[in-house]
Amino acid sequence: MLRVRCLRGGSRGAEALHYIGSRLGRTVTGWVQRTFQSTQAATASSGNSCAADDKATDPLPKDCPVSSYNEWDPLEEVIVGRAENACVPPFTVEVKANTYEKYWPFYQKYGGHYFPKDHLKKAVAEIEEMCNILKMEGVTVRRPDPIDWSVKYKTPDFESTGLYGAMPRDILIVVGNEIIEAPMAWRARFFEYRAYRSIIKDYFRRGAKWTTAPKPTMADELYDQDYPIYSVEDRHKLAAQGKFVTTEFEPCFDAADFIRAGRDIFAQRSQVTNYMGIEWMRKHLAPDYRVHIISFKDPNPMHIDATFNIIGPGLVLSNPDRPCHQIDLFKKAGWTIVTPPIPVIPDDHPLWMSSKWLSMNVLMLDEKRVMVDANEVPIQKMFEKLGISTIKISIRNANSLGGGFHCWTCDVRRRGTLQSYFD
């Protein structure tokens, strides 16, 4: 049975960390192993500190606009992205490593230019409808500023055009009353934070914490310029060996490679998130939160929420095509593992930046309500069997830009408290 403990002082949950960390430590070496060891040591030492306990249990300001600890508490405020002016990223090595071969000619032809006009128009309409429905469900909706992403920019290390302000989940993560800007890893996303600054400054003035992770230079050394990509089999072998297009030259991560479950936050090493980036998050959030690395049989890992999506206390959707190597740890902790059905999105529908498994990239409005694609009947039935009501919207054209409901949003405020689901 899943055990849930509200954090009101006392134990810091070192036992739970030992349970997860010790087992994960057996499957990893080098940097990853040292990360878990240092996390365990930091947590254990904090258990003897009254000051640390006080810090962890300080109440948030009652009027703080930012407060979210997990993926399922009742949603009160959310940022929803924009498809307007979205541009195809230049076909650089990091973009090639994250996209399917059949779309490479598309990137080579249109890189630096807007996505197809008619497609963007449909995507914009879909997201507007999504915003309207969220408002009807009682959720406050914020939108990023519109920006012309076709403008070329240059740093001392590279030049590029932009991408979009469509996926706030990729760049922002809320932990408690703190909103963290991720540094990103694609050169086309270097200045993506600009679309969200007016919103974040407003939250900051109203009492939220605001942190920007160290911005990488994105110099050539951050990328394996000779990353060998010839087939899915090659990618499987490379991922199994812990080899990705991003190196450990400097910290980089996308916020969407982290998923929250109260005190415990799970992260994956991916094509856009390196161990240095995960280590930065671990150090930044310790001792109040515990960051754990998990991995999957995934030839092209990029963002965790279409592979492993936590939808309730002790309840997770686990992609059958990308099984989690550490899934037994969750089972032993009393979690329920749900395997979502195969997506029904047609083969000829363009998915320039993602896979069909966006069907499981859902947004929980609370434990009993989920926003799901209107076309994905099999997963709707799955949720209904779980006793979860479905709010159906079609965002197929918006999917083409690389995200489902979870990707298109960043939940800023959920009504709930910090709890531990592994103690």
Curated annotation (Swiss-Prot):
Q: Which family does it belong to?
A: Belongs to the amidinotransferase family.
Q: Where is the transit peptide?
A: 1-43
- Residue positions, PTM N6-acetyllysine: 385
Q: Write out the annotated subcellular location.
A: Mitochondrion inner membrane
Keywords from the UniProt entry: Acetylation, Membrane, Mitochondrion, Mitochondrion inner membrane, Phosphoprotein, Transferase, Transit peptide
Function statement: Transamidinase that catalyzes the transfer of the amidino group of L-arginine onto the amino moiety of acceptor metabolites such as glycine, beta-alanine, gamma-aminobutyric acid (GABA) and taurine yielding the corresponding guanidine derivatives. Catalyzes the rate-limiting step of creatine biosynthesis, namely the transfer of the amidino group from L-arginine to glycine to generate guanidinoacetate, which is then methylated by GAMT to form creatine. Provides creatine as a source for ATP generation in tissues with high energy demands, in particular skeletal muscle, heart and brain.
Cite the annotated pathway.
Amine and polyamine biosynthesis; creatine biosynthesis; creatine from L-arginine and glycine: step 1/2
Looking at its record, which EC class is this enzyme? Answer: transferase
Instruction: List the protein's name.
Output: Glycine amidinotransferase, mitochondrial
What does the record list as GO biological process? Answer: creatine biosynthetic process; learning or memory; muscle atrophy; positive regulation of cold-induced thermogenesis
Q: What is its EC number?
A: 2.1.4.1
Q: Which gene encodes it?
A: GATM
Per the UniProt record, the lineage of the source organism begins with:
Eukaryota, Metazoa, Chordata, Craniata, Vertebrata
The positions annotated for binding arginine are: 170, 305, 322, 354-355
